[in-house]
C-alpha cells in the first residue's frame, strides 16, 4: 500500500501525459516488430477468459488498439496467420502472446496444450508472423528467477534496487530446505514450474497434515518447489503491481500498471477475473 500511496501522490503533481503516451509507444513497438504493418493486424493471444492475467491482457489489447484472440480464432496457412471471424479472414503480422512457452504450439512443445496454435512456431520460424515476446523469454516467469533480479541490477546497472522484491528461493538449495524443515510456519511454498502450478501452501495457516504432506513433496523433488518468506502482519502490503514496457525504436516503461491483491507471501492472488480484484494504478 505504501507503493500505491507514493504513486498516487506523484500523479497529483506530475503530468499524466506519460500515461496517455502508453498506447502510442506500445502500438509503435507492435508496428515496428510487424515490419511496418498497422496495429490493426496485431492480436493479443490469450489462453482463455478464466486465466489469472485476463484483465492485464484485456488492458494491453485495448491500450495498443489490438484485439484479444484465442487459439480457436486463429489459423495458420501457407501465407501466414489469419484471424477468422465468420467469413472474414484478417492477416495477422504480429502476435503479442500471453501464453506460456510450453503451451504456445502443441506441434512444437506440449502436445496436450489446448490453448496453443498448431504450426505457429513454424510460421514464426519462416518469417510469416512475428511473436512478441519470442519463445524462450518465458524463462523470466520461473519463480526462482526472481532471486537473481537484485544481483542483476547491481551487476549491470551498478545500482541498488529501488524496491525490495518478494524473493523466491529454490528448495533445492540445502540451506533453504533446512530452514523450511526447521520452521515451516514462517514460509509459503509454491511450485517452481509454471506449466504445472499447484495451490501454494502457507505455513502459518496450514494444518499439521497439510504441512507434513508439503514437506514430503518437497523432500521427494525439491527442484519443483520454491520457498518464500511470509510477510509480517504489520508489514504494509495489499497489491502486487505489474507494469508494461515496450522495446520498439527505444525502450519505454510508463508510470502505471495493473494492481492485484497480494497473498501473505507477496504473491498475487490466483485469479483476477472481475473488476473488484484488479485495478489500474497510475
Show where each model-derived region lies.
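Domain-scale recognition of functional cores that engage charged ligands
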Residues: 1-281
